[in-house]
Amino acid sequence: MRSGLIAQKVGMTRLFTDEGTHVPVTVLKVEACQVVAVRTSETDGYTAVQLGAGVAKVKRTSKAMRGHFAAAKVEPKKKVVEFRVSEDCLLEPGAELSAAHFVAGQKVDIAGTTIGKGFAGAMKRHNFRGLEATHGVSVSHRSHGSTGQCQDPGRVFKGKKMAGHMGDTRITQQSLTVVATDADRGLILVKGSVPGADGAWLEVRDAVKKKLPEGVPLPAGLKAAVEAAVDGEKE
């Protein structure tokens, strides 16, 4: 099981295939994604890598976190996430991952926080049809109607779909297709939409419900390996 990546949502655009059909894609940027810490079975009871991405200002980083980053010899990071990995996919602290970690055609799971919508009614939040426009209905056209209880049980069940806060929740979209990657610019293009607003941090992992395709770098798509391959081609 490989590590994932921390990426930042840039926005949406579209690509055209050779046949002329367009594919809507979301652009994700991988910036300074490095290993900050390593968890091993001997010391922690499980195996994982802690990644950090983005470059944070030193004055906005706590003293404890400054020491944490200094131990790994990396710059302060804006976002830190831990990914569970198998023992053969552990990485060294300070190692930098690139967009080449994923390949075109691969399926990935992307986790993030959805855009907050504030307090929303039942029609917007749960797609209720609302009440009648006429026939005695007044004022309450967009209400959710009866909550379905009587003297017994004399309460509204937990989880009842009603008006309330909408959005700003953590979700994972599964089995999204990687259309293309650009390791030089640190870009990953994923088909369709992903959770979050532009600029939001996302966790990109290998899809748990799909097999890894051939050509996926193991244990990870390290930036040093990509640069070495480019230098070899120039020579």
UniProtKB/Swiss-Prot annotation:
Gene3D superfamilies: 3.30.160.810, Translation factors. The modification N5-methylglutamine is found at Q151. Keywords: Methylation, Ribonucleoprotein, Ribosomal protein, RNA-binding, rRNA-binding. Methylated by PrmB. PROSITE patterns: RIBOSOMAL_L3 (PS00474). It comes from the Bacteria. One of its GO terms (cellular component) is cytosolic large ribosomal subunit. One of its GO terms (biological process) is translation. The keyword Cell wall biogenesis/degradation does not apply. InterPro entries: Ribosomal_uL3 (IPR000597), Ribosomal_uL3_bac/org-type (IPR019927), Ribosomal_uL3_CS (IPR019926), Transl_B-barrel_sf (IPR009000). One of the primary rRNA binding proteins, it binds directly near the 3'-end of the 23S rRNA, where it nucleates assembly of the 50S subunit. PANTHER family: 50S RIBOSOMAL PROTEIN L3, LARGE RIBOSOMAL SUBUNIT PROTEIN UL3C. Belongs to the universal ribosomal protein uL3 family. This is Large ribosomal subunit protein uL3. It comes from Rhodospirillum rubrum (strain ATCC 11170 / ATH 1.1.1 / DSM 467 / LMG 4362 / NCIMB 8255 / S1). The lineage of its organism: Bacteria, Pseudomonadati, Pseudomonadota, Alphaproteobacteria, Rhodospirillales. The gene is rplC.
